[in-house]
Amino acid sequence: METQTRKAEVAHKLIETGESLLNIVWYRADERRAASLEIIARTAYTAEESACHYLETIGLDRKGRIRETLELACYQDTNEQTHEDIFARDLNGLKNWGDRFLARHIAVIIYWIFAITTLIDHELAALLGEAVEVEAVKTYRRMLIEQSDEWLNQPAVPTALRYWNKPNSMWRVRGDRQPASMREVVESIVKDESDHVHANAQKAIAF
């Protein structure tokens, strides 16, 4: 965790506990785990966007910080949607009905948890998001170690190439080169998740 406060420790412990339960089902760092967890994790940004829209609508955004947070959450959401599409669509990580059912139902629960928490205590919601991304970094670093060279050296999937070609994508803004293999795609995703850790830490003190 980038944020070193008591509340951040509590947030990280909560997410670690949830992660340990999910590890029972999705224990390998593969496309199945990545696709399922991205559905769940991305929902947190969707919920934050909804809550920020509401707070802005009722007139609480006097300094423009809520709008800035909303725009950042939308940018992060788009990036996480790309991750989901890479592993769920291109690599067929959600081919099992059970994975789709479980991931999507957990995502609905996560949506309401994050939406309500954002309305009540945005700092805590952002710290929970930071903790989620800390765990995501671990997952993708494991993927680089646990997946076979054959898997990592396969060509970069179409979604990854389309995302890189967007001028405002995180990969282009950061200066990443166009990925040629899945190894390079995963390396860029590790950087994405690390950037989300920092962004969520900053959002925790935004308003």
What are these regions (language model features)?
Residues 1-207:
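Non-heme di-metal
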